[in-house]
Amino acid sequence: MFGLRKSPANLPKHNSVDLKSSKPNPFDSDDESDNKHTLNPSKRTTSEPSLADMTNPFGGERVQKGDSSSSKQSLFSNSKYQYKNNFRDSGGIENQSVQELEGYAVYKAEETTKSVQGCLKVAEDIRSDATRTLVMLHDQGEQITRTHHKAVEIDHDLSRGEKLLGSLGGMFSKTWKPKKTRPINGPVVTRDDSPTRRVNHLEKREKLGLNSAPRGQSRTREPLPESADAYQRVEMEKAKQDDGLSDLSDILGELKNMAVDMGSEIEKQNKGLDHLHDDVDELNFRVQQSNQRGRRLLGK
């Protein structure tokens, strides 16, 4: 009877795991036992800020600004790539939003302005080269003229020598006279209206600001405010394009006039060279005659 009575020690132990876990481990250190008695961070009240939510008071804003700037740059580069690609990777132009189309219009306007400015720069370089070429042509014409003047001086010296050769000989010798097929007239080209004067006149007018559009530098426009919309930015780019095209038209007109001057200068030089060639041939013929006369006199 007494053997069948259940003792409290034999009762089912439902909380044996909890009791075992609550017993201190003899192998645990004092620090670990103290940490077990501290509060669990997950059981803190919501009013207490967690360490993960705390931000650095000195560097938090800088990090956020850096993230925002990098994100803006990535968005800008992505949009610029889409603009260059004409939205081929995103469904085409017809499937874009109004904001994307406005940015696309501004991008195209800026690219057109850059193209116009590039053409203007090329035209200015061509004008500089044309100016130097025109001056070189003028110097070449001056050299031809000086050479022809030297031929005239040779003609005068040769005429005096021919007179001396004609007076030499004996009393009974035949009088010698040189044969002249044509007179030596000298340079025919007049250089009153030289290309250098026209070039210098053009440069002086440009420095004084008297030309209609001196290289596009006379026009200055106020920059747009940061709050300007896409329409205002496009209109600003269109105004820049108009100015650039006007300057380009003026430079092309100057290049046309320079080309005409070059053509007329080359034509004058060709005529001058023809006259110089004829005079040199005449001088060469007369020199040969004088040499023959001298050899005959020495042979006697």
Swiss-Prot record:
Keywords (A to Z) from UniProt: Cell cycle, Cell division, Coiled coil, Membrane, Phosphoprotein, Protein transport, Transport
The t-SNARE coiled-coil homology domain, residue ranges: 235-297
GO molecular function, one term: SNAP receptor activity
Subcellular location: Membrane
Entry's induction text: Locally and systemically induced by pathogen infection and locally only by mechanical stresses.
SUPFAM superfamilies for this protein: SNARE fusion complex
GO cellular component: cell plate; plasma membrane; SNARE complex
Biased composition (Basic and acidic residues): 190-208
Entry annotated with the keyword Cell membrane: no
Intrachain S-S bonds: none
Keyword Chloroplast: no
CDD domains: SNARE_Qc, SNARE_SNAP25N_23N_29N_SEC9N
Family under the similarity heading: Belongs to the SNAP-25 family.
General function of this protein: t-SNARE involved in diverse vesicle trafficking and membrane fusion processes, including cell plate formation. May function in the secretory pathway.
Subunit organization: Interacts with the cytokinesis-specific syntaxin KNOLLE and with SYP121. Binds to EXO70B2.
Protein name, as recorded: SNAP25 homologous protein SNAP33
Native source species: Arabidopsis thaliana
Encoding gene, per UniProt annotation: SNAP33
